[in-house]
Amino acid sequence: MHTLTLKRVLGFTIVILLLLALFIWGIGLETLKARQVDLLYLGQRHLMLVFTSMFFALLVGIPSGILLSRPAAKGFAEYVMQIFNVGNTLPPLAVLALAMVIIGIGDTPAIVALFLASLLPIVRNTYAGLCSVPASLIEAANGIGMTKWQRLRQVELPNAWPVMLSGIRIATAINVGTAPLAFLIGASSYGELIFPGIYLNDFPTLILGATATALFALILDTLLAWFGRRLSPHTV
């Protein structure tokens, strides 16, 4: 277990170092110093968009997955999941454009669009994880007199957690990768570096925004994996 953890840490460190090397080579120290204030400010705005939309996605997605996995919902759960699947086929840019038409420009439509983009993996994996809990465990929980709430909290959720965490990690990666597009509807993010870099053929600025986004995604995914191992060290 310790060897596996060490390999993961080493692999992550190598990836970070390679990205930093590409980062410095691509933009130069002068560009990094000139854009330092922008990088910090846009990083805070990017974090705000991701964390706010993920908070609401978790707040809605996990309870929805739990409700759909209950025996009373078996008859229509698959139909509801199909609706989520159809919604997920929409490109992120189309979702952002739709949110802009309905709500306007700024942070609010961006958060709504990122929330919708992140929702499906959380609902799907929560539902799949709970449905995959062995029937023998549920029967054993019923046999010792657990209530439905106790069974869910002490038996089903702990066993479904690895699958649920996988969905949360996927949703976070989608969210972080989509957040730069929020620049197109008036929300501040690393897109303010990426898209002007494309329009103006400014390669250093483009690399600065893209690398910052990639590092952000890697760091968040690593933190989520560590958090998952802390909660369930024998299964994650």
From Swiss-Prot:
Predominant subcellular localization, coarse grouping: membrane
Family note: Belongs to the binding-protein-dependent transport system permease family.
Alphabetized SUPFAM superfamilies for the sequence: MetI-like
UniProt-listed InterPro entries: ABC_transp_perm/SBD (IPR051204), MetI-like (IPR000515), MetI-like_sf (IPR035906)
Keyword check for Aminoacyl-tRNA synthetase: no
Subunit structure: The complex is composed of two ATP-binding proteins (OsmV), two transmembrane proteins (OsmW and OsmY) and a solute-binding protein (OsmX).
Name of the featured protein: Osmoprotectant import permease protein OsmY
Matches recorded under CDD domains: TM_PBP2
TM stretches of this protein: 9-29, 47-67, 95-115, 126-146, 180-200, 207-227
Subcellular location: Cell inner membrane
Domain ABC transmembrane type-1: 43-224
Induction entry: Induced by osmotic stress. Part of the osmU operon, which consists of four genes (osmV, osmW, osmX and osmY).
Disulphide-bridged cysteine pairs: none
Keyword Transmembrane: yes
Summary of the knockout phenotype: Deletion of the osmU operon eliminates the residual osmoprotection by glycine betaine in a mutant that is lacking the ProP and the ProU systems. OsmU deletion has no effect on the utilization of glycine betaine as an osmoprotectant when ProP or ProU are functional.
Membrane topology classification: Multi-pass membrane protein
Organism superkingdom: Bacteria
One GO cellular component, as annotated: plasma membrane
Gene transcribed to yield this protein: osmY
Keywords: Cell inner membrane, Cell membrane, Membrane, Transmembrane, Transmembrane helix, Transport
Any Gene Ontology biological process: transmembrane transport
Role played: Part of the OsmU ABC transporter complex, which is involved in the uptake of osmoprotectants such as choline-O-sulfate and glycine betaine. Probably responsible for the translocation of the substrate across the membrane.
Pfam family, one: BPD_transp_1
